[in-house]
Design a protein with these regions (language model features):
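Cytochrome P450 fold signature focused on the C-terminal beta-domain
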Residues: 17-22
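Short beta-strand to alpha-helix junction loop
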Residues: 1-4
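Conserved C-terminal structural/oligomerization subdomain of aldehyde/semialdehyde dehydrogenase
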Residues: 7-8, 12, 24-160
Length: 160
């Protein structure tokens, strides 16, 4: 399993890995927390119960947000803050398709809350959103010059 290999690789490379009772056959991946030293140490999304944690100083937040944006992955972002203006600032600098503030980042229900990513995480169209079906349509415009047919309504409506 790719996720179990990734978790093992992180542990072998000296990262702090917190996990509980991984199944030996790879059919289940326990929720896992991996503490990274820098945002530069993660280069792709991990679709599984893995939470990466990066400690940073307050004055480094702008650099972190810029680095996240440059990764070009934008599925989901979670922000926990008691300072609403700080949360708003983070949201405005994010490219995430869905952002959750002071709550968990799971539980989007298609039909209730549009869900989808941007950049390398998706097309930007939201499953369950009002414009979702448009991505499957090829829009065409056809214009006929009826005067070229003589403008006669009877001739225009003739069947073969």
């Amino acid at each position: 399993n790719m996720l179990l290999e990734y978790i093992s690789e992180c542990s072998n490379n000296g990262y702090q890995v917190f996990s509980h009772n991984q199944a030996p056959d790879g059919n289940f991946v326990s929720p896992t927390l991996i503490e990274l030293n820098s945002i530069d140490e993660i280069n792709e999304e991990k679709f599984g119960p893995i939470l990466h944690v990066i400690k940073y100083k307050t004055d480094e937040l702008e650099q972190i947000l810029t680095a996240l944006k440059n990764k070009q992955y934008g599925l989901t972002m979670g922000v926990h803050s008691r300072i609403e203006s700080k949360a708003d600032d983070i949201i405005n600098k994010s490219i995430a398709g869905n952002t959750y503030i002071n709550r968990d980042i799971v539980g989007a229900v298609v039909g209730s809350q549009p869900f989808g990513g941007t950049g390398l995480s998706g097309t930007g169209f939201k499953a369950g959103g009002p414009n979702y079906l448009l991505q499957f349509v090829d829009e065409r415009s056809i214009t006929k010059n009826t005067v070229a047919f003589g403008g006669n309504a009877e001739i225009l409506n003739l069947e073969d």
